């Protein structure tokens, strides 16, 4: 994935995270029970962490022009983080808002995608060729 695309996606997820966090803090508490607000806030928390990771992947892809294998792994990490946000955070948002329990089993898949993304991130970091001056 291109660096500019990842930077845009990471920025968008971050901005949406701010909106959802504010909604959870100010509006959602009037609509649903406190335990479900906490579920929603967990989704926001993980969205923020991984939006930042997507931004970092975008920057590192941009900086690693001399290491295509690292770029590829950072790109794969970011894709896993994107899928993880949709599945993990998205399922928590849906569960909190609707109370529909079948959203629950989607959450662990998103968590696995986060873990896989971090594995790719570590592999990418190990592939970085440091330029010596």
Language model features: what each stretch is:
Residues 1-133:
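Polytopic transmembrane helical bundles with strong interfacial aromatic enrichment
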């Amino acid at each position: 994935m291109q660096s500019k695309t990842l930077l845009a996606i990471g920025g968008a997820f971050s901005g949406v995270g701010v909106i959802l966090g504010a909604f959870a803090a100010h509006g959602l508490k009037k609509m649903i029970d406190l335990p479900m607000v906490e579920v929603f806030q967990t989704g926001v928390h993980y969205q923020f962490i991984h939006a930042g990771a997507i931004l970092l992947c975008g920057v590192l892809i941009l900086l690693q022009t001399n290491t295509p294998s690292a770029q590829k792994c950072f790109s794969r990490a970011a894709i896993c983080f994107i899928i993880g946000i949709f599945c993990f955070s998205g399922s928590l948002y849906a569960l909190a808002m609707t109370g529909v329990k079948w959203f629950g089993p989607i959450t662990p898949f998103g968590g696995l995608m986060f873990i896989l993304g971090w594995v790719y991130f570590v592999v990418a970091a190990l592939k970085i060729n440091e330029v010596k001056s």
